Regions:
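Hydrophobic alpha-helical positions that pack around
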Residues: 1-92, 98-103
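Flexible, glycine/charged-enriched surface loops at secondary-structure junctions
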Residues: 7-10, 68-70, 103-112, 179-183, ...
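Active-site gating/interface segments in enzymes
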Residues: 18-19, 25-33, 100-151
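Conserved active-site and cofactor/substrate-binding residues in soluble primary-metabolism enzymes
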Residues: 47-55, 68, 79, 87-90, ...
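Structured core elements
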Residues: 72, 83-85, 94, 110, ...
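Short, flexible active-site loops
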Residues: 74-81, 138-141, 153
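Ferredoxin-type iron-sulfur electron-transfer modules in oxidoreductases and energy-metabolism complexes
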Residues: 131-147, 157, 161-222
Length: 222
């Protein structure tokens, strides 16, 4: 169908997480690499997801502001899974109650996906323009194994799509070595969670690196 429209090319990509990341898409589609600290525009690219593209179209062509958002409600323990068009600002509780309420065996609700999502502490929190999914997890799915010591296997570095060394960033973060964290490009972390997923020692690498990244960015902008 894209052949009907000038300037549109549909390009199939491998099903590889996190291929949908901004810099990963540029590399896969244009074979260009955005340098550390750089922006897509530096290599002649602008990346927008489908929701943003639709919002721009609605604003320009229909004079419609961004007042609603598509939200997927899902999870193995959630019986009434659905895709809903929700007004921005709607309390999360309203969405969940509309679909029958929180299941008894749900232990945690995640805003976002299983890899990059964040736990919801308050169901009265509002739906934001970036709220794409509500994921319900059981106790078994949220169970964390005891944290061990880093064995320097390098699996986290092999899995990192940004070419970082999470095992090193973890060590620097635990010692509060902010300058070294910046020198090792902690600010380039896209928080995909691949390091956490692959770590055989069950070290909470994503949580540690996310906090360290925030501290470094505050200093840079400072």
């Amino acid at each position: 169908k894209s052949s009907k429209y000038d300037g549109i090319v549909v390009l199939p990509l491998m099903k590889k997480y996190p291929e949908g990341g901004e810099k990963q898409l540029i590399d896969a589609v244009m074979h260009r690499q955005v340098k550390s600290g750089g922006l897509p525009i530096d290599v002649g690219a602008v990346v927008q997801n489908v929701a943003t593209a639709l919002a721009v179209y609605d604003a320009v062509q229909k004079n419609k502001p961004l007042i609603d958002n598509s939200v997927t409600v899902t999870g193995e323990c959630f019986p009434k899974q659905a895709n809903l068009l929700v007004r921005v600002g709607t309390p999360l509780r309203y969405i969940i109650d509309y679909l029958g309420g929180v299941p008894e065996n749900a232990a945690k609700i995640i805003s976002g996906g299983p890899m990059m999502g964040k736990a919801i502490a308050n169901l009265d929190a509002a739906t934001l323009k970036g709220t794409g999914a509500l994921l319900f997890l059981t106790e078994e799915q949220t169970k964390r194994h005891p944290e061990g010591h880093c064995i320097r296997c390098g699996k986290c570095a092999d899995a990192c799509p940004m070419g970082l060394e999470p095992f090193l960033l973890n060590r620097l973060a635990r010692h509060g070595m902010t300058d070294e964290l910046e020198a090792n490009a902690v600010q380039d972390c896209i928080e995909c969670g691949c390091c956490l997923y692959t770590c055989p020692a069950n070290i909470p690498l994503l949580d540690i690196i996310r906090l360290a990244k925030g501290d470094v960015i505050k200093i840079i902008r400072g």
